[in-house]
Every structure is written in C-alpha cells, then in structure tokens.
Amino acid sequence: MKFHIIFCLLAALMMTSAFAEVTVEPLRHSNKNPTESECKNACADAYAKGDQSRIPEAHNFRDYYCNCHITVQ
C-alpha cells in the first residue's frame, strides 16, 4: 500500500514537471533592448533544447541577453 501511494505521488510530480513557465527580465546589450516577447522566445528555445549554458542568460542570434527564470509548475 505504501508503495502504491509513493508511486502515485511520483507520477503526479513527473506530470507537473512537464509544464514550465518562462519569466524573463530583458537586459540591455550592444545598443539593443529586447522586448519581453523576444526574450521569452529566446529563453523558451534555450530551455526546450536543454542548453543549460544559455540559462539564465539566453543569447540569441540578434546579439542580446535576457535573464531567464524557469519555474516548473
């Protein structure tokens, strides 16, 4: 019985970890000021690719940096 309860809790935790919310803080870099939408796209892209080197600062092709805060829900 204990095993069943632990298994259910673990399964629920794994299901919730599939949903991640990306919040960002744009940072100025190289005379460019990215929008929140551009940062979200850059951060989400880095997160989806599992590129941990680009988190928390996701660098994209337009040469700007964004602070990415990944919160799992």
UniProtKB/Swiss-Prot annotation:
Post-translational modification: Contains 2 disulfide bonds.
Keyword RNA-binding among UniProt keywords: no
Tissue specificity field: Expressed by the venom gland.
UniProt-annotated location(s): Secreted
Gene Ontology cellular-component annotations: extracellular region
Assigned keywords, A-Z: Disulfide bond, Secreted, Signal, Toxin
Protein name, as recorded: U-scoloptoxin(15)-Sa1a
Species name: Scolopendra alternans (Florida Keys giant centipede)
